[in-house]
Amino acid sequence: MTGKSQGDEIIIPFKNLINDAYCRDISIKIRSHLDVKRKNGEYIGAFVPYGYEKSDDDKHKLVIDIYAAGIVKEIFRLKLHGMSQDAIATQLNNEGVLAPMEYKQSTGSGYQTGFLQNDKSVWSSVTVRRILENEIYIGNLVQGKRTTPNHKVKQEVVKPESDWIRIEKNHEPIISDRDFEIVQRLLGMDTRISPDSDMVYNLSGLSLIHI
């Protein structure tokens, strides 16, 4: 028994070392494979951004979802006219526009979100802002923002922006570059809200335009 026990003390750690090396090697290969796809402009997310859908011919290619893209355009139009994110969300909810999760589920997707009201997903200022800030709508595909430190740690961390994989003009845009840039400037200056909270004071004298 003593001999067997001493053998186990040597063999078991060795097996663990081999298994760990194998898992690390597999993890590195998977990461490398996914990065190649990202650099090739292939969309590898499970759920597509609101306003787009996966092409029937290529699941890694984004194409415009006509209905949702129309809502995205309206959100940008309202922002360009000075409305706050909260006011935009309220208007969309009042008009009965399905929030992204509800819309995706209506199309057969299992997408989930935390913004619920009476067990129903609703538009929120956070959702609106995420859309307004997302350069996916000018045709840029940005992926690889998060990672896990190694194969043993499951908790994701945000990577430095310099390490993100950005492919510009990768797919058909919904919003023009000019309108997107103006909106980013407006978002950066949303520091004063008018008394009724519906409109944001124009702090810069920017010339707003229609989409």
Feature locations, PLM:
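Conserved catalytic breakage-reunion loop centered on the nucleophilic residue
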Residues: 1-209
